[in-house]
């Protein structure tokens, strides 16, 4: 009799274990939320975007925004492109 029961349990195991696992998981999930309770989210005074704007304003307050590097000076410090390594330099 035991071999017949083991064969039946082996054959129908997916049909038995999935609903059991689903019920155990659902009960555990609900029990965990019941014990833990709903989390209280802290209310932020400013959004991240507002904080970023404030930080950039504070950084630019001490700088003179009219003094900028010219493009010619800026291009001298840029590295040469990888694709132009094997080309001959123009004289």
UniProtKB/Swiss-Prot annotation:
Signal peptide: none
Membrane topology: Single-pass membrane protein
Compartments it resides in: Membrane
InterPro entries per the UniProt record, alphabetical: UPF0767
Keyword Transmembrane helix assigned: yes
Highest taxon of the lineage: Eukaryota
One GO location term (cellular component): membrane
Pfam families referenced in this protein's UniProt entry, alphabetically: UPF0767 (PF15990)
Xref: PANTHER family: SMALL INTEGRAL MEMBRANE PROTEIN 12
Family stated for the protein in its record: Belongs to the SMIM12 family.
Identification of the protein by name: Small integral membrane protein 12-B
Species annotation: Xenopus laevis
